[in-house]
UniProtKB/Swiss-Prot annotation:
<feature type="region of interest" description="Disordered">
    <location>
        <begin position="197"/>
        <end position="272"/>
    </location>
</feature>
<comment type="subunit">
    <text>Interacts with ESF1/ABTAP. Interacts with IGHMBP2.</text>
</comment>
<comment type="function">
    <text>Could be a novel TATA-binding protein (TBP) which can function as a basal transcription activator. Can act as a regulator of basal transcription for class II genes.</text>
</comment>
<keyword id="KW-0238">DNA-binding</keyword>
<feature type="domain" description="RRM">
    <location>
        <begin position="46"/>
        <end position="142"/>
    </location>
</feature>
<dbReference type="GO" id="GO:0000480">
    <property type="term" value="P:endonucleolytic cleavage in 5'-ETS of tricistronic rRNA transcript (SSU-rRNA, 5.8S rRNA, LSU-rRNA)"/>
</dbReference>
<keyword id="KW-0804">Transcription</keyword>
<feature type="compositionally biased region" description="Acidic residues">
    <location>
        <begin position="23"/>
        <end position="34"/>
    </location>
</feature>
<feature type="region of interest" description="Disordered">
    <location>
        <begin position="1"/>
        <end position="38"/>
    </location>
</feature>
<dbReference type="GO" id="GO:0005730">
    <property type="term" value="C:nucleolus"/>
</dbReference>
<feature type="coiled-coil region">
    <location>
        <begin position="161"/>
        <end position="191"/>
    </location>
</feature>
<dbReference type="GO" id="GO:0034462">
    <property type="term" value="P:small-subunit processome assembly"/>
</dbReference>
<keyword id="KW-0694">RNA-binding</keyword>
<dbReference type="InterPro" id="IPR012677">
    <property type="entry name" value="Nucleotide-bd_a/b_plait_sf"/>
</dbReference>
<dbReference type="GO" id="GO:0003677">
    <property type="term" value="F:DNA binding"/>
</dbReference>
<comment type="similarity">
    <text>Belongs to the ESF2/ABP1 family.</text>
</comment>
<dbReference type="GO" id="GO:0000472">
    <property type="term" value="P:endonucleolytic cleavage to generate mature 5'-end of SSU-rRNA from (SSU-rRNA, 5.8S rRNA, LSU-rRNA)"/>
</dbReference>
């Protein structure tokens, strides 16, 4: 009896062991398939936007700082305008500084090989100091990072090409406007020269314009002196003025009251 019961138990345990082995094999197969799928899955890169770039901060600096958190791909920094750089140089020259200013940047984009790392870096480093060391020149500058969702490097290239095209069109429009103004000025000058040549005034051989103005006091006196008898009247008037000044001077010296006009002879009235 005991032998029969042991045989039955052995026969019952054999199918159980077989089912366990099949389950283990299926699990191993699923794990291997998952691993194969994971190896075939393409890693999607992610781009982080830098809104603030301190002076003298270069792409090599950002690559060295962010490579500690993940693999960094392409890096692009937008340079400042030439007008701003020219103003900085002029200010430095006016202040007596002979130091040459290098080109600074206004914004930048950093590409990470894995977008999950890019999200993690943007979320953890935002508003934190750039330099960890005490002597770092960027210690008091903060990271201004933002992860750009569904943004690829091709979008950035298209955006930069569009801005470059807009800048060229604006420059062409400004050049055309300046050319139109210059042509209008030259046409006006030529029209004025033709008008002067057609006028034929011998008093203006060089084409200069004359304007009628009111005569000055000196011109009026010269005209009166040029009249017949005008020189004698002018001589008498100057002599009378000199006599008045002499009498006033003597009166101030000796303390006598100055002679009144009634005590003097009748004054000559100038002819108008």
């Amino acid at each position: 009896m005991e032998a029969e019961e042991s045989e039955k138990a052995a026969t019952e345990q054999e199918p159980l062991k077989g089912t366990e082995q099949t389950l283990d094999a299926e699990e191993e197969q699923e794990e291997s398939e998952d691993a194969a799928c994971g190896s075939k899955k393409r890693v999607v890169p992610g781009i982080v936007y830098l809104g603030h770039i301190p002076p003298r901060f270069r792409p090599l600096h950002v690559r060295n700082l962010l490579s500690a958190y993940g693999e960094v791909g392409r890096v692009f920094f937008q340079a400042e305008d030439r007008f701003v750089r020219r103003k900085k140089k002029a200010a430095a020259a006016a202040g007596g500084k002979k130091r040459s200013y290098s080109k600074d940047y206004t914004e930048g984009w950093v590409e990470f090989r894995d977008k999950r790392i890019a999200k993690r870096v943007a979320a953890s480093l935002h508003n934190t100091p750039m330099g960890a060391r005490r002597r770092s020149p960027f210690r008091y500058d903060l990271w201004n990072l933002k992860y750009l969702h569904r943004f690829t490097w091709s979008h950035l290239s298209e955006h930069l090409a569009f801005e470059r095209q807009v800048r060229r069109q604006r420059l062409r429009a400004e050049v055309a406007q300046a050319k139109r103004e210059t042509d209008f000025y030259l046409q006006s000058v030529e029209r004025g020269q033709r008008f002067l040549a057609a006028d034929g005034d011998p008093a203006r051989p060089d084409g200069s314009w004359t304007f009628a103005q009111r005569p000055t006091e000196q011109e009026l006196r010269a005209q009166k002196a040029a009249r017949p008898g005008g020189r004698e009247r002018a001589r008498l008037v100057t002599a009378q003025d000199k006599a008045r000044s002499n009498k006033g001077l003597l009166a101030r010296i000796f303390g006598a009251p100055p002679p009144s006009e009634s005590m003097e002879g009748p004054s000559l009235v100038r002819d108008s």
